[in-house]
Every structure is written in C-alpha cells, then in structure tokens.
C-alpha cells in the first residue's frame, strides 16, 4: 500500500482555497462596484447634459403652469399689463429670503435652481429698486427655517416694522410711481393653520391672539396703508399656500390690481413679470371661495389646534390610555368652500347679513383676464319627447 504524501496534498488544497477566496473577493468587489465598472466599460447611454436638460424642461413647465394658473383678482382701469417696467417691491415676502417656493410635506422639493421674485423681474427685463431690495434682503429676517412640529416657527409671520417702510417711501417714489406689495403665507400637510398670529417684526417676536393666520397682521396693514398713501398705482401679489381674507383690496383706491399665486415651485416666479408686463394673459380660476370673513364658514369652528401646548405633547398615532392624539373633528361634513356658501345662499342664510355679495368677495371659479369676451348663442336645438321639452 502506497502512502499519501500529506504535505503535497495540503499544499494543493491550500492553493485551491486561496484561489477560491480571491475569486470570491473579486466577485464581491465587482458586484459592489458593478454600476461604476459597467459605466467605465460601455458607458451609461445618457447624454452628459441629461440633468441640465431635464431641469431646464422642468423649469419651463413650472413657469407655464403658473402663467396659466395665477388668478387675476382685480384690474381696475386696466392697470395691468403695465408699460412701465420700473417697479418697487414692498413686503418681506417679495425678498430673496422671504419668497415662498413650496409648502411642506409632499409638496416639498429640491432647492436647486430656485428663481427669486426679484431675479425673475430682472431676467425678464424689468428694473427693480435695488436699494429697497437690498434693504429687505439684509433686514435680518428669513423664511428659510427648518420645518418642525412647532407652529410658532412654521407659521411665523415675518415682516419689517413701519419705520422701515416709511423711511424709504420718498426714495422709492423717486425711482418709480408704481409699487408691488407681496403678502406671503406658508402651509402644508400635517398641520392646521393657527387661529392666532405668531409674528417676528424686525426681530421682535410676539403673538397676536386677536387675528388668525390668514388675515393681514397689524404691521402688514400699516405697510399697505403707507404704500397706498404714497403711490397712485399699487399692485398686490398673494404668494400663499391658502387663500386669505382680502377685503382690504377694496379699501384703498390706489390698489389697482391684485394677483393670487400659490406656491409656484422653483421657476414659477417667472410668470409674475410676464403677466404684469403683458407677455402673457392670466387665465387662472379660483379653486376655492374667498370670503370677506373666514369665521363665516362652519369649518372655522373646528380648524386648528386651540392649545399648542397640547399640540406639541400629543401623538400622531397612539393606542395608549391617557395620551392625546392629534385630530380635527369634521362636523361641517361636505359644507366647505362653495358647498357651504352656495348652499347657505340658496337657503337664505345670508339674507339678514346683506346677501351673498356681502359675504363672498371672490366666488369659486372666479378669475379675470386681459382679453374681453362676447357671449352669443348661435343655435338651439330642442328635442321633444312626450309632453315635456328637454
């Protein structure tokens, strides 16, 4: 019987094990870096400008949507479009740090390639009051804050004080005889809007329990009045996630036009100077009813969290006894928006309050245009079936 030469056998086995280990490691590396290796060997089949092209097309689409979606609420004496392309922009919401691009939650997106309102005007050939714009940009306020569970942060109304505005009115009037006032409000999923106002006015933080979030603050009212008393041609732009109380548009004769623009994305701001300058005609219609007083809606009774101490200590989901759960009671059923206001009018609910027109400022589907239209019935066909005509 021949004897096995163990050292040789062990040597061969060890060599095979080493080879297997190397192959296994190589396979692991190849698998981990497969996309990189494949791209190096055969390329990815994509244009090197793919991302830039896609972003450009997305920006064009966003602008086009806003051109067709912005609602012209008011246009006295056909003030818009204007041939004067020199503009003063008042209101912190119109500044580079104040302009809102998107809401929170699912409506949020990348901040890459954002076009501020001031840049939009400049890119389309307008001349803005740069001294005024710089003052707003360096006033120490910013709407670029992290989204939190704290309504005092998310829904803080940030604006400058009255002295900031009045001290710049004379210089602004010398620059141009027209002014644009921008009013901004944030919004998104997961939070009701507060029934009172958290404010940051030139760095001074306060709470106004007499006003809800979607009406002008005292400081905004003061700004509007000061600007309207100085300029004979004033435009108002609402950059808001939700509609606001807008009765003040009828208070000042110098407010000639008003536009409603919800969050327009990164490039939607381009639509504003194009509409105001007559490059496109606004054609948007309201998807909501705008009442003079939001408390006239039954949904107001149950909206918001009355106590934000409770709001911050409660849970989104919980089955533990004794823990608060965040909720809103929808007692109003379907009667929100035009469902409520049109039904209530039909039932005569507003008769003792001056009628429907005293309650509703802008009805569902409202929206003006630069174009004029005539209505003419060219023909009518009557189908008679039995004793009744259809």
Task: Give, region by region, the residue ranges found by the protein language model.
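C-terminal non-catalytic regions of proteins with extracellular/luminal or membrane-system context
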Residues: 1-390
């Amino acid at each position: 019987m021949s004897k096995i030469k163990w050292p040789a056998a062990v040597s061969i086995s060890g060599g095979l094990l080493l080879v297997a280990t190397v192959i296994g490691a190589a396979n692991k590396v190849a698998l981990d870096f497969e996309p990189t290796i494949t791209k190096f060997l055969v390329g990815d089949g994509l244009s090197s400008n793919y991302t830039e092209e896609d972003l450009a097309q997305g920006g064009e689409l966003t602008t086009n949507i806003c051109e067709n979606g912005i609602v012209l609420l008011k246009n006295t004496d056909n003030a818009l479009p204007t041939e004067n392309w020199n503009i003063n922009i008042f209101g912190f919401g119109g500044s580079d740090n104040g302009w809102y691009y998107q809401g929170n939650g699912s409506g949020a997106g990348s901040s890459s390639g954002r076009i501020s309102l001031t840049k939009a005007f400049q890119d389309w050939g307008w001349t803005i009051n740069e001294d005024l714009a710089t003052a707003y940009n360096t006033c120490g306020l910013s709407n670029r804050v992290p989204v939190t569970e704290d309504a005092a942060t998310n829904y803080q109304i940030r604006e400058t004080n009255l002295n900031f505005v009045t001290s710049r009115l004379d210089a602004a009037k010398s620059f141009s005889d027209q002014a644009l006032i921008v009013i901004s409000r944030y919004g998104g999923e997961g939070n009701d809007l507060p029934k009172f106002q958290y404010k940051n006015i030139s760095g001074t933080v306060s709470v106004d329990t007499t006003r809800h979030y979607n009406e002008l603050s005292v400081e905004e009212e003061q700004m509007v009045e000061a600007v309207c008393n100085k300029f004979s041609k004033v435009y108002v732009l609402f950059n808001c996630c939700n509609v606001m109380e807008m009765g003040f548009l009828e208070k000042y004769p110098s407010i000639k036009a008003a536009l409603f623009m919800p969050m327009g994305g990164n490039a939607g701001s381009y639509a504003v100077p194009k509409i105001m300058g007559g490059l496109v005609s606004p054609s948007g219609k309201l998807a909501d009813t705008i009442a003079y007083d939001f408390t006239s809606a039954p949904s107001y009774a149950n909206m918001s969290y009355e106590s934000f101490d409770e709001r911050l200590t409660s849970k989104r989901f919980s089955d533990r006894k004794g823990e608060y759960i965040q909720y809103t009671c929808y007692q109003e059923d379907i009667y929100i928006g035009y469902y409520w206001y049109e039904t209530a009018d039909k039932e005569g609910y507003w008769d003792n309050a001056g009628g429907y027109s005293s309650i509703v400022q802008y009805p569902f589907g409202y929206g003006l245009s630069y174009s004029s239209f005539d209505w003419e019935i060219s023909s009518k066909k009557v189908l008679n079936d039995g004793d009744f005509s259809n």
